[in-house]
Amino acid sequence: MQREKIAIAYSGGLDTSIMIKWLKDKYDADIVAVTGNLGQQKEIENLESKAIATGASGFHFVDLKKPFVEDYIWRALKAGALYEDVYPLATALGRPLLAKALVDVALEENCTMLAHGCTGKGNDQVRFEVTFASLAPHLKVLAPLREWEFTSRESEMDYAIKHNIPVSATKKSPYSIDENIWGISIECGVLEDPMVAPPEDAYQITTSPENAPNEATVVEIEFEQGVPVSVDGKKMAGLDIINRLNELGAKNGIGRLDMIENRVVGIKSREIYEAPAATILHFAHRELERLTLEKTVFQYKKNIAQDYANIIYNGTWFSPMRTALDAFVDDTQKPVTGMVRLKLFKGSVTLLGRQSPYSLYNESLATYTEADSFDHKAAAGFIQIYGLGLKTFSEVHPAK
């Protein structure tokens, strides 16, 4: 009888490290570990040897950086997608791509099951499993963290120690960290108390604003149809742009976020994020839209931004709704071309200037100097018509 084969999403962290042995023992199955590279800086080296030593029979390392930037991050940026107006969705954006990569490997390896290391009260279980259902509904899905005997990260670490499984978490510093090029999420430990300020050791890449340089960094970012194409006049690939802005932003203490957010499963959670490049690019992109988008489009697009952010956060990336919103967003971005100049200083991003060949700002209409070309006399008739409805209402319903 042919053995079962399980493809697991493997990060090398605590949960997925012990999951290899746990699944192998429980299902007497071959384990294929799949790691996707989304630009994370840590835990990439030696992952294959670690997975094999832990019990995996196969390992796939999939470089997803380019599609992550071009097909996911840029789409979210153009949409202005910030979950609950704060979170740039780094982890959430990566999940559908990682899930797709896992499905691709599972089909290639003739696996019968898929497994992920998401908790039973988190968002990621929804994101992975909804994607699995969208792309490979015939494959059985396993979620060990919803059924195994471990009740805390401490008990998981005890299991890892017992079976000589190397992990980076410790009982003294039990942070759960997820990282990709668009940002880092940090949770667990003392961070679960919303009144406790994040300890400095929780932050992975950003300098404390208080310790950031005393001299500001000025940066110019150029966009073409809503997509960043250069930094300080130098044309770059998307991946290089994000890396450069992460470097500049982190040095200047940009992108530290601390929020209480509403999870898909109905609970509130306290999340710490580091997202220097995302913070800078969303700010710059929004300011360029202010300059180039017609008023009603600019205002309505705020609603689309929230809808798009919810789609990403809630795990329905592979949906007709997202495809439909992309069509709207892409049309709005046709004039979003130009340059934005910013100042990065001790945790803050300040606008210094912006320009575009499609700018709707007309200085001769806006100025209060002798160059003013606005017809002031036209305002009287406009106001009379504009306020006619309220005037009529007040005549029927006089104020008391």
From Swiss-Prot:
GO aspect biological process, one term: urea cycle
Sequence positions that bind L-citrulline: Y87, N123, R127, S176, S185, E261, Y273
Record-level Gene Ontology MF annotations: argininosuccinate synthase activity; ATP binding
CDD domains hit by this protein: ASS
Record-given protein name: Argininosuccinate synthase
Cellular localization per UniProt: Cytoplasm
Catalytic activity: L-citrulline + L-aspartate + ATP = 2-(N(omega)-L-arginino)succinate + AMP + diphosphate + H(+)
Similarity-based family: Belongs to the argininosuccinate synthase family. Type 1 subfamily.
Assembly and interaction partners: Homotetramer.
Organism lineage: Bacteria, Pseudomonadati, Chlorobiota, Chlorobiia, Chlorobiales
Biological pathway: Amino-acid biosynthesis; L-arginine biosynthesis; L-arginine from L-ornithine and carbamoyl phosphate: step 2/3
Pfam family, one: Arginosuc_synth
